[in-house]
Amino acid sequence: MRAVDTNILARFYLRDDAVQGRISADVLSAGDVFVPKTVILELEWVLRYVADQPEDKVLDCLAHLIALPGITVEDRDEIEAALRHCRNGIDFADALHLAASKSCSEVLTFDDRGYARRAKKLRLKPPVQVPTAKQQIPRRTRPTDS
């Protein structure tokens, strides 16, 4: 199995370099390819903010990527959940953080206007909370060395 970096996938989807585009297509079509979730996160950023692609097109590219035969995606279920959350208005990076935190009791953020409010409206789990100065944050106690 071979892992790919973001630039291989960017060239495949953007087709902005004919030679590298063909090579990247050959790499992906050969199969036995591993895509780390950090590469998917970076690809979303490159497509949206560097290549200035609309969000729906970017999400379609990511959905296409994870559905390709011969492609193994790290934590695929988290990527799929992040895509669903993102299509409902959550920023992709935040959506991926939320999906990766599925076993936690809550996600803490200072982004009240965007992330926390949207997540609450969508009733996403774990709940996304904004900690306040008045709120008591439970502290874990460490076992003492004896």
Language-model features, listed with the residues they occupy:
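Amphipathic alpha-helical segments within well-ordered protein domains
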Residues: A25, E44, R48, A63-I66, ...
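Short beta-strand scaffold positions
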Residues: V4, V35, V73, F92-A95, ...
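Short, conserved active-site loops that position catalytic residues or coordinate cofactors/metal ions
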Residues: K37-W45
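Residues that scaffold the ATP/ADP-binding catalytic core of kinase and kinase-like folds
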Residues: R11-F12, V46, R118
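Acidic catalytic patch
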Residues: D60-R87
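Alpha-helix capping/helix-boundary segments
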Residues: I8, V39, E78, L96-H97, ...
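Acidic, PIN/NYN-like endoribonuclease modules and their adjacent C-terminal/linker elements
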Residues: M1, L98-S146
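Short, well-structured N-terminal submotif of metal-dependent ribonuclease cores
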Residues: M1-V35, V50-A63, L68, K125, ...
